[in-house]
């Protein structure tokens, strides 16, 4: 006992003196002043600047540049005068493939040096201009389709010959089967299209055979098509969401109900429910062991090995390999053994953790409104994310369109007089000014980047990201401080519930906004700076991954690991600092120091008790998310059939996307509800440590903790002497 007391005194001297008894202290201090005013002013200035950036982006930006394709004159397809023509057709897709950067195409809408027209639907077959069309008396209206030609050309009334129309690129002289990908008509030469029997005999590019023509088009446009096909996958996923959103919402509602029921059960039967939870996880592990063993034995006659299978994206193939189930079996056995050993050696600490959770449950029983606060945090985070996304989109589409004179076919006539930087106006452009170059056209190139606002778009995007991260971290900090103040009001109420303040959550929220915006912004700023460094490291690692030598890669890995650990540590310190701010109203640095010293003086209790509680709450999340995930899997994969035609799984492109969405949403919902519990446990634990240091159980300095906690710690309050 003497050695233990000596170690405690040494820790106290190293990490500050224990908290002293204060007869006037009975919970969160009401008489407080504003803290970290400089950081508060800085945060307000950043928010004001963020609003200005959003307004400028809204004034200069136009999301239609990304949402809708454009024809050669820069007019949007699918809206305005082209409302019934949602897709864009490229006369010579080969020019797009050779002259277009893929990333620029995705952002700028795939503008390339060939005529583009808006069409109602993409061509679905092969077609090439007949040789008869080149005869002197051939009429263009007999060979071209009006819909596929530029709108200014009227085939019935034109005086142009077929050759002149081709040279001026007023109509396409060939097209292939195309598919509308993001409303762009891109070649679809897969499957039976490669069969020469399905291709007209006259279909070929000049100087090439049919097979050479197909090969040239396929090879030249493969990268372009694949790039837009990836975006098309996103549209297919969006279609799945449109078909299943009602069922996704239903799954999320079930997750919310299960989470609330779990918390209500935890309030009344915390010990029983937690032990059931622990043994339930062990039972799930045991079932997994049995299942893996059963499948392992059922494949005893299989000769399939990993060397036979090789690498494949088909996961089902690996499940047919016997060694796969053996690996699963070994892993589950190890995990099960570790859990059983932890349960045996930490059983006493688990009892203390249960007591903390019971105390938190009692607090929630008196402050049920705290369970609704995650909704406030979610709404504020949704506002931050929406504002960031909309601002980023408008910034990316800022700038007036730039048109330049381009020779679409330099082999026809003398086009040397056309300068590369010669701009034009598509409304007033007259091709007769370039009589020596019949293919001269006024073509949209890109958007203006020469103005003051446009030159700083990259810097504004960086500002957008930094302000977004700061706002998100501030919202989270506000939630921590608000909940901490409410739970601290409960703990430091000596006679519960009589001494609990009225509307403790609202009072705590108002105190945080009135006095501690600067302190919360200070903590959020520190975390934001670390997150920015991590983002930069991830970018550099991705940018130079191929060029790095082993030493550089090792150094980069070490830096990423160190800053990841630093971010986790800062989050831990911030969380406890916000608790101290909510209780005592000090500035961020003082609160962080006091919280850190208090935790270090009780490091054993912190590591064991607090983390055991976190582990138990994580198991609760796992149970909720796992149950909802299994239900979603059986439903969206068609294993649970609904009567009638209410829902058909076959109508989905990727049935796993709704499953992932439900699981992810269920995790967010469970995390929101359990975060209240987690914050309550952390706050009560910190108050509990302060209670042990401030008080000794005497009549003058009684403990504020519950009788259950005092019983576990062999503590008790002495009754005041009477008479």
From Swiss-Prot:
InterPro entries in alphabetical order: Choline_transptr-like
Membrane topology: Multi-pass membrane protein
Reaction catalyzed: choline(out) + n H(+)(in) = choline(in) + n H(+)(out); thiamine diphosphate(out) = thiamine diphosphate(in)
Entry GO CC: apical plasma membrane; plasma membrane
Segments on the Cytoplasmic side according to the record's topology features: 1-36, 267-269, 347-374, 486-516, 600-615, 677-723
One annotated GO biological process: positive regulation of cell growth
Keywords: Antiport, Cell membrane, Glycoprotein, Membrane, Transmembrane, Transmembrane helix, Transport
Compartments, as annotated in UniProt: Membrane; Apical cell membrane
Protein's UniProt name: Choline transporter-like protein 4
Natural source organism: Danio rerio (Zebrafish)
């Amino acid at each position: 006992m003497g050695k233990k007391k000596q170690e405690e005194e040494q820790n106290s001297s190293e990490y500050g003196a224990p908290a002293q008894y204060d007869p006037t202290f009975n919970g969160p201090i009401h008489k407080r002043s504003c803290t970290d005013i400089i950081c508060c002013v800085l945060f307000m200035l950043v928010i004001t600047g963020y609003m200005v950036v959003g307004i400028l982006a809204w004034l200069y930006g136009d999301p239609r540049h990304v949402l809708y394709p454009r024809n050669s004159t820069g007019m949007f397809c699918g809206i305005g005068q082209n409302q019934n023509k949602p897709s864009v057709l490229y006369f010579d897709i080969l020019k797009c493939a050779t002259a277009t950067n893929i990333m620029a195409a995705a952002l700028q809408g795939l503008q390339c040096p060939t005529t583009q027209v808006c069409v109602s639907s993409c061509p679905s077959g092969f077609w090439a201009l007949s040789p008869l069309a080149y005869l002197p008396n051939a009429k263009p209206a007999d060979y071209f389709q009006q819909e596929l030609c530029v709108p200014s050309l009227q085939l019935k009334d034109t005086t142009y010959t077929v050759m002149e129309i081709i040279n001026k690129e007023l109509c396409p002289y060939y097209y292939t089967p195309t598919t509308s990908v993001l409303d762009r008509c891109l070649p679809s030469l897969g499957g039976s299209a490669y069969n020469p029997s399905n291709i007209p005999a006259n279909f070929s590019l000049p100087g090439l055979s049919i097979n050479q023509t197909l090969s040239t088009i396929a090879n030249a446009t493969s990268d372009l098509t694949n790039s837009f096909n990836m975006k098309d996958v996103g549209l297919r996923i969006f279609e799945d969401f449109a078909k299943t959103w009602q069922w996704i919402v239903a799954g999320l509602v079930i997750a919310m109900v299960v989470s609330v029921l779990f918390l209500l059960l935890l309030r009344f039967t915390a010990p029983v429910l937690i032990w059931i939870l622990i043994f339930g996880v062990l039972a799930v592990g045991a079932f997994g062991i049995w299942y893996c063993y059963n499948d392992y034995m059922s494949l005893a006659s299989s000769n399939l090995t990993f060397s036979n299978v090789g690498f494949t994206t088909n996961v089902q193939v690996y499940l047919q390999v016997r060694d796969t189930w053996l690996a699963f079996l070994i892993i589950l056995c190890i995990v099960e053994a570790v859990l059983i050993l932890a349960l045996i050696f930490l059983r006493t600490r688990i009892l203390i953790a249960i007591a903390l959770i019971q105390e938190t449950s009692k607090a929630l029983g008196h402050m049920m409104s705290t369970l609704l606060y995650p909704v406030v945090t979610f709404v504020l985070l949704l506002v931050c994310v929406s504002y960031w996304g909309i601002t980023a989109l408008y910034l990316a589409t800022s700038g007036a369109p730039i048109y330049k004179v381009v020779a679409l076919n330099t082999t026809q006539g003398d086009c040397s007089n056309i300068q590369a930087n010669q701009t034009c106006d598509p409304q007033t452009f007259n091709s007769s000014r370039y009589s020596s170059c019949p293919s001269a056209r006024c073509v949209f190139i890109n958007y203006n980047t020469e103005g003051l606002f446009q030159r700083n778009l990259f810097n504004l995007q960086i500002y957008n990201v930094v302000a977004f991260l700061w706002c998100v971290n501030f919202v989270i900090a506000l939630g921590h401080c608000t909940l901490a103040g409410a739970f601290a009001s409960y703990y430091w109420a000596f006679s519960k519930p009589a001494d609990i303040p009225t509307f403790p959550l609202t009072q705590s929220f108002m105190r945080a906004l009135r006095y501690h915006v600067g302190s919360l912004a200070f903590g959020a700023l520190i975390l934001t700076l670390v997150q920015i460094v991590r983002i930069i490291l991830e970018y550099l690692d991705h940018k130079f991954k191929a060029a790095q030598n082993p030493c550089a890669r090792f150094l980069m890995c070490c830096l990423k690991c160190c800053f990841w650990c630093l971010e986790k540590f800062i989050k831990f310190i911030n969380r406890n600092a916000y608790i101290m701010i909510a209780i005592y109203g000090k500035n961020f640095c003082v609160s962080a120091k006091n919280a850190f010293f208090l935790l270090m003086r009780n490091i054993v209790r912190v590591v064991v008790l607090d983390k055991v509680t976190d582990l138990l709450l994580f198991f609760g999340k796992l149970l909720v998310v796992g149950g909802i995930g299994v239900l979603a899997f059986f439903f969206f994969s068609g294993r649970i059939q609904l009567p009638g035609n209410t829902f058909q799984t076959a109508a989905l492109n990727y049935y796993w996307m709704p499953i992932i969405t439900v699981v992810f949403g269920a995790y967010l919902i469970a995390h929101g509800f359990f975060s209240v519990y987690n914050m309550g446990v952390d706050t009560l634990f910190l108050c509990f440590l302060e209670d042990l240091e401030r008080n000794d159980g005497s009549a003058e300095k009684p403990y504020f903790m519950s009788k259950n906690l005092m019983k576990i710690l062999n503590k008790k309050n002495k009754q005041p002497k009477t008479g």
